[in-house]
Amino acid sequence: MSSAHFNRGPAYGLSAEVKNKLAQKYDHQQEQELREWIEGVTGRRIGNNFMDGLKDGIILCEFINKLQPGSVKKVNESTQNWHQLENIGNFIKAITKYGVKPHDIFEANDLFENTNHTQVQSTLLALASMAKTKGNKVNVGVKYAEKQERKFEPEKLREGRNIIGLQMGTNKFASQQGMTAYGTRRHLYDPKLGTDQPLDQATISLQMGTNKGASQAGMTAPGTKRQIFEPGLGMEHCDTLNVSLQMGSNKGASQRGMTVYGLPRQVYDPKYCLTPEYPELGEPAHNHHPHNYYNSA
């Protein structure tokens, strides 16, 4: 079987764009660091082309055997393609047992067919990090953080349920305590009075503000008839021509005595005439009859 059978042809279109983007992520400085590390451990020269020197899998198998003796039982020195692929497969299995995560490991074709050298480099960096974690002196990669396990007694765990974490905020200021669901009935009362049951709905809680100033007391639904009068006079409901003092001042210009548009108006002075009277038909307009409301005497 010839080696040309395993080599892919040039990529075109979208495949070429993907291959170029992967090639742009390749770090040549890290390649030099990996070269020095592998050559220092194995004692073998990789060659001018880093990936071509690793393609047969021989150096990779010897490398993992140095880090973890006995990882690869047999290293194939043959130049046959399937032997080289077998070496790469044995290396992948060995580093998996060594502790490298599966998502950090390249596939055999990424190296053998030159499809993704960036992933091969990432795998070697992950292997360096794992070797550093295990105590090997490596100048490449970063050391993985060690687990810091903590064991708590069941009583401590139960006590933690009664504590409000700072991430939940504070309960010392204004809150939604006492709020009910939208549309449900609310009972308003002053909890300082010491009453167990809420009072009637006409009682306004001090938490809702004061009802000593202007309010909407006596307001009716839109469109209904309104009876306006002065409750301080002790009178019952008067006609709608009298305006209550709660509606403002009636000493200046006002709409006092105004009626609905189109209705007759009764105009008189309440200081002199308690009830309005109208002149009879044919009677002079300016006589001094007692019931005449034009009389100003």
Curated annotation (Swiss-Prot):
The cross-references to InterPro entries, in alphabetical order and at most eight, read: Calponin-like (IPR050606), Calponin/LIMCH1 (IPR001997), Calponin_repeat (IPR000557), CH_dom (IPR001715), CH_dom_sf (IPR036872), SM22_calponin (IPR003096)
Which residues get modified to Phosphothreonine?
170, 180, 184, 259
Q: In which tissues is it expressed?
A: Smooth muscle, and tissues containing significant amounts of smooth muscle.
Which residues are in the Calponin-homology (CH) domain?
28-131
Domain of life, per the record?
Eukaryota
- A GO MF term: calmodulin binding
- The ranges of the Calponin-like repeats are 164-189, 204-229, 243-268
Phosphoserine: which positions carry it?
Answer: 175
**Which key words are in the record?**
Actin-binding, Calmodulin-binding, Phosphoprotein, Repeat
Q: Which GO terms describe its biological process?
A: actin crosslink formation; actomyosin structure organization
For this protein, the record's SUPFAM superfamilies field holds: Calponin-homology domain, CH-domain (SSF47576)
Which CDD domains does the protein's record reference? CH_CNN1
| Gene3D superfamilies per record | Calponin-like domain
What SMART domains would the database entry show?
CH
Q: Could you tell me what this protein does?
A: Thin filament-associated protein that is implicated in the regulation and modulation of smooth muscle contraction. It is capable of binding to actin, calmodulin and tropomyosin. The interaction of calponin with actin inhibits the actomyosin Mg-ATPase activity.
Cross-referenced PANTHER family, in alphabetical order? CALPONIN
Q: How does it assemble?
A: Part of cGMP kinase signaling complex at least composed of ACTA2/alpha-actin, CNN1/calponin H1, PLN/phospholamban, PRKG1 and ITPR1.
Which family does the record claim for this protein? Belongs to the calponin family.
- The protein in question is named Calponin-1
Q: Which organism is it from?
A: Sus scrofa
Gene name, Swiss-Prot/TrEMBL = CNN1
